[in-house]
Amino acid sequence: MLFLMAVMVSFSAICFASHGTDLDAEEKIVDQFFAGKDYNKVTAFMDPSLAKDLTAERYNNMFTEMNKDLGKMTEKNLRVYQVFDDGHVLSYAAKFEKGAVLALDVVFKAEKGKFSIVNFRIFDPTAQAPAQADNKAEKK
């Protein structure tokens, strides 16, 4: 019985090892990207379509504005790891110096064992669309 349990645990560990390696690599990329320091290093991990839209100037301005409004990111906790045939989505709860807790989604494309950021977004998960806020105000 003990042998059977050991085999089952070993087999499940082997099956999930690939996602663990992928996740580790992607989290390192997220850390480098959101450090907001060296655009030239970050472009190595960006999909060409994202690199075309997110120029060095826009990247630097994004972090200047974020630091001014939110402060630096102090902590991020992985909440969801979604796996698709052609990539992954990592969703975090991100805490900032000025107290805000925002959601951070990073979309990766996987090609030949290499990962590149295709898109990302930082948003307030508690924010409501204006129409929803107006409807709630009318009901009161």
What does each model-identified segment do?
Residues 12-35:
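Short, low-complexity N-terminal intrinsically disordered segments enriched in polar/charged residues
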Residues 24, 40-87:
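Short solvent-exposed beta->alpha transition segments
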Residues 2-12:
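Bacterial N-terminal signal peptides
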Residues 81-140:
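Exposed beta-sheet edge and beta->alpha loop/turn motif
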